[in-house]
Amino acid sequence: MILPIYVYGQPVLRKVAEDITPEYPNLKELIANMFETMVHADGVGLAAPQIGLPIRVVTITLDPLSEDYPEFKDFNKAYINPHIIEVGGEEVSMEEGCLSLPGIHESVKRGNKIRVKYMDENFVEHDEVVEGYLARVMQHEFDHLDGKMFIDHLSPLRKQMIRGKLNTMLKGKARSSYKMKQVK
């Protein structure tokens, strides 16, 4: 089922999400719906707060990039209760966008190597070091779980330059090709 994506201005996007337990109701269905919603909206990542749930669940698919990056073939993964333990490596600037910020794309600096702990869909714990593009996507999505958005990493000048677009979202007038839940 395709779910509406919550747009900038929705309070859930600024809340710190809670860890969940294996007893969380209908988790497999939720994860399937998150993948379907993300792919339908042409995203590579989706955090549960973006569909209105303040819980620590993220889905990432890099498969759409596999034509240029064969190592991403069939990469579809859910992360439960993820936490970044360490950010390192070279700081790299790259343009980012966000399904909760339709029409906004800005350059963001992030470390290109992270250590992350998370659980998979079977609640098996993992501790991994991740580099490159996946490290960036993880940082972006995991920020959502801490009530942050990529625009929080922008300079005051860049934030001022996108203020008009943000105000449009705050008025509930954002436009996109996918189903959204806007501020009323």
Curated annotation (Swiss-Prot):
Pfam family name, one: Pep_deformylase
At the top level of its lineage, which domain of life is listed?
Bacteria
What reaction(s) does this enzyme catalyze?
A: N-terminal N-formyl-L-methionyl-[peptide] + H2O = N-terminal L-methionyl-[peptide] + formate
InterPro entries xref list: Peptide_deformylase, Peptide_deformylase_sf
Q: Which molecular function GO terms apply here?
A: metal ion binding; peptide deformylase activity
Residues reported in the UniProt entry to bind Fe cation = 98, 140, 144
**Does the entry annotate any disulfide bonds, and if so which pairs?**
none
Q: What is its EC number?
A: 3.5.1.88
Q: Which top EC class applies here?
A: hydrolase
Q: Give the co-factor note.
A: Binds 1 Fe(2+) ion.
Q: Which CDD domains match?
A: Pep_deformylase
Q: Which GO terms describe its biological process?
A: co-translational protein modification; translation
Q: Where is the signal peptide?
A: none
Family, as annotated: Belongs to the polypeptide deformylase family.
Function per UniProt: Removes the formyl group from the N-terminal Met of newly synthesized proteins. Requires at least a dipeptide for an efficient rate of reaction. N-terminal L-methionine is a prerequisite for activity but the enzyme has broad specificity at other positions.
Q: What is this protein called?
A: Peptide deformylase
Naturally occurring in which organism (per UniProt):
Bacteroides thetaiotaomicron (strain ATCC 29148 / DSM 2079 / JCM 5827 / CCUG 10774 / NCTC 10582 / VPI-5482 / E50)
Q: Which gene encodes it?
A: def
